Regions:
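Glycine-rich, acidic/polar active-site loops that bind/position phosphate-bearing ligands
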Residues: 1-439
Length: 439
């Protein structure tokens, strides 16, 4: 669907028996929120926006200055296919602003949109694609999630070892109904672990797609009596789940990642910027204490390095051709806020271009092998969430690109997460209640 005016939206609502309209947004951690507006009140909501209490949303506002307004992006309208066909449910993604129309520093969609505009001013077009991994778990007799995966399958397995085939099919078909373009789906390495890759799009559209994808997966899992988890490391002895982010740059219709990448080219400088700032970005790409259990094994990187093909590297250049040429950042996980994560990756690449950073030579070693990595003098990603917060708080780069209010609130909330886990009598139970059941 593609609509540009309020009247277009109202006509669609009337023609398609829509009774509820979700005004969707996310908190600073990327947890989706929404307010459902009845169709009879939609005209007013489109005209005036929808007011809400920002002090009740993680990382938004203090109670003494809590009023905020949701402004829908009309281009994002979509029907939710898993909801009833009688009295249908429609959804917008929204930007968040202050009641007087002033910008709100916690509007993560706005941050990503502004970052993309900076590339457009340079004559550059950014495309972003994602590869999202997740686990499917059984529920107990009371409908509560268990830690029992739905199968014993491994990488690329098929039925009967793969019990998720039909769910992935339903997920992909629902994605297509909602205007997304799934490309590949398969069983991943872990028992009950799955991956679905989505075709690249513009940065903002891709971030919206990540939010929608997680909605779809959870809804279809729930419909089948299962629990879908996007926790980075839900099972200690199984592979972690990543959200690999693929990026390409175009100028005058040419993919700058196609062919050999000169160290001082635009693509080379972009990669150099991402690598240079990767430690500072980690608190945003890997926002949970659990995120750091994933690094250094099962194809999740630990060292700041790049290579062609090598999956032990932080940045990989796949051996492909044409529009598929890209760089792949392998550290992010699906618990991240995709608007902040993608926006900051673009900001790091842009800083590399602005500073004319030169890409260092590739490292063609297996960095999952400690003996191989030893002596190379490579920087490592932060080992804990506390370290990631400290690195980010000391970052001059982040002070330059992030609104001060947003970064302060984000770091404060992250430190609260760390303190809550440290003080929990049973850390495993704390992680299950606050993360496994919710992420």
């Amino acid at each position: 669907m593609s609509y540009s005016t309020q009247q277009d939206i109202l006509d669609f609502v009337e023609d398609n028996n829509v009774k509820f309209v979700r005004f969707a947004f996310c908190d600073i951690f990327g947890t989706q929120k929404n307010i459902a507006v009845l169709a009879s009140n939609l005209s007013k909501a489109l005209e005036e926006g929808v007011c809400f209490d920002g002090s009740s949303i993680a990382g938004f506002m203090h109670v003494e200055e809590s009023d905020l307004v949701l402004r829908p992006d009309l281009s994002t309208v979509t029907i939710l296919p898993w909801r009833p066909t009688e009295g249908r449910v429609m959804q917008f993604f929204c930007d968040v602003e202050k009641p007087d129309g002033a910008a709100f520093s916690g509007n993560c969609r706005g941050f990503l949109r502004d970052m993309n505009r900076k590339f457009k001013k340079l004559g550059l077009t950014c495309n972003v694609g994602t590869e999202c991994e997740f686990y499917l778990f059984e529920k107990d007799d009371r409908g509560r999630p268990t830690c029992i995966p739905i199968d014993f399958g491994g990488y690329f397995d098929v039925a009967p070892l793969d019990a998720g085939e039909n769910l992935r099919r339903d997920i992909c078909l629902t994605m297509e109904q909602m205007g997304m373009a799934p490309q590949h789906s398969h069983h991943e390495s872990g028992n009950g672990q799955n991956e679905i890759d989505c075709r690249y799009a513009g940065p903002l559209k891709t971030a919206d797609n990540v939010m929608t994808f997680k909605q779809i997966v959870r809804a279809i899992a729930m419909r089948n009596g299962l629990h879908a988890s996007f926790l980075p490391k839900p099972l200690p002895q199984q592979a972690g789940s990543g959200l690999h982010i693929n990026l390409s740059l175009y100028m005058d219709g040419k993919n700058l990642f196609e062919g050999d990448i000169a160290p001082d080219s635009i693509a080379g400088s972009f990669m150099a910027g991402v690598l240079a700032h990767s430690r500072e970005l980690t608190v945003f790409t890997n926002p949970l204490p659990n995120s750091y259990q994933r690094f250094g094994c099962d194809e999740a990187p630990r060292y700041v390095s790049w290579s062609r093909q090598n999956r032990s590297q932080l940045v990989r250049i796949p051996m492909v051709k044409g529009d598929s040429c890209r760089m792949e950042l392998r550290s992010p996980d699906p618990a991240c806020n995709p608007y902040l994560a993608i926006g900051l990756i673009l900001a790091a690449g842009l800083d590399g271009i602005d500073q004319r950073m030169v890409l260092q030579p590739p490292v063609n070693r297996n960095l999952f092998d400690a003996a191989e990595a030893e002596g190379l003098g490579l920087e490592t990603l932060p080992a804990t969430l506390e370290e990631a917060v400290q690195v980010a708080e000391e970052s001059e780069f982040l002070r330059k690109v992030l609104p001060e209010g947003l970064s302060k609130r984000y770091f404060s909330e992250e430190l609260k997460r760390c303190a809550a886990l440290r003080s929990a009598p049973d850390q495993a139970e704390h992680e299950r209640v606050y993360y496994f059941n919710a992420i």
